[in-house]
Amino acid sequence: MRVLGVDPGMALLGYGVVEGGEPLRALSFGVVSTPAHLPVERRLVVLHDELAQLLEHWQPDVVALEQLFFARNVTTALAVGQARGIVLLLCGQRTIPVVEYTPAQVKQAVGGYGRARKREMQEMVRLLLRLPVLPQPDDAADALALAVCYFQYSRAAQLERFT
């Protein structure tokens, strides 16, 4: 099972590809960046094209996407929503299932605490994926955490079936 975690954003869209198994294995992670000087419609094309290449190359079985839970800044929320739309469109076109998680769900599944701090989360991702250093930038680390979250919730669901 291969999962692509996506932390959506207009300026930076984080991605992380994780292969299931014991242990979980990070295959790739990074960010897709869009130049701020481009108009929004061109930035969306950049996100679309780069993410399409990632989906084609890694062939994930599922995409774990951060759910837009709330935002203090309306402009930021709109930009994140537009980036999420690109992710959902591409997955829909390829019939790739999308599972959405709130930041609190990711923190609970990966960090063991729904209010874990960013550094704690990065350290847990590093440990769970046996990475030599903390994953950077933050958007890529968040995307890896989303992919790990998918596996953690899947394991919990399997355990519940046997109890």
UniProtKB/Swiss-Prot annotation:
Question: Gene3D superfamilies attached here?
Answer: Ribonuclease H-like superfamily/Ribonuclease H
In the UniProt record, what gene is named as encoding this protein? Answer: ruvC
User: Could you name the active-site residues?
Assistant: D7, E66, D139
Instruction: Cite the cofactor comment.
Output: Binds 2 Mg(2+) ion per subunit.
Recorded catalytic reaction(s): these are: Endonucleolytic cleavage at a junction such as a reciprocal single-stranded crossover between two homologous DNA duplexes (Holliday junction)
Which PROSITE patterns does the record associate with it?
A: RUVC
Family under the similarity heading: Belongs to the RuvC family.
Q: What does this protein do?
A: The RuvA-RuvB-RuvC complex processes Holliday junction (HJ) DNA during genetic recombination and DNA repair. Endonuclease that resolves HJ intermediates. Cleaves cruciform DNA by making single-stranded nicks across the HJ at symmetrical positions within the homologous arms, yielding a 5'-phosphate and a 3'-hydroxyl group; requires a central core of homology in the junction. The consensus cleavage sequence is 5'-(A/T)TT(C/G)-3'. Cleavage occurs on the 3'-side of the TT dinucleotide at the point of strand exchange.
Q: Which domain of life is it from?
A: Bacteria
What would be one Pfam family of this protein? Answer: RuvC
Ranges annotated as spanning the membrane: none
Q: What is this protein called?
A: Crossover junction endodeoxyribonuclease RuvC
Q: Which residues bind Mg(2+) 1?
A: D7, D139
In short, the EC number is 3.1.21.10
Q: What class of enzyme is it?
A: hydrolase
NCBIfam families, per database record? PRK00039.2-1 (NF000711), ruvC (TIGR00228)
Give the source species.
Answer: Thermomicrobium roseum (strain ATCC 27502 / DSM 5159 / P-2)
One Gene Ontology MF term: magnesium ion binding
The record's keywords, sorted A to Z, are: Cytoplasm, DNA damage, DNA recombination, DNA repair, DNA-binding, Endonuclease, Hydrolase, Magnesium, Metal-binding, Nuclease
GO cellular component terms given for this protein:
cytoplasm; Holliday junction resolvase complex
Q: Which cofactor does it need?
A: Mg(2+)
Biological process annotations from GO:
DNA recombination; DNA repair
Binding, Mg(2+) 2: E66
Localization, UniProt: Cytoplasm
Q: How does it assemble?
A: Homodimer which binds Holliday junction (HJ) DNA. The HJ becomes 2-fold symmetrical on binding to RuvC with unstacked arms; it has a different conformation from HJ DNA in complex with RuvA. In the full resolvosome a probable DNA-RuvA(4)-RuvB(12)-RuvC(2) complex forms which resolves the HJ.
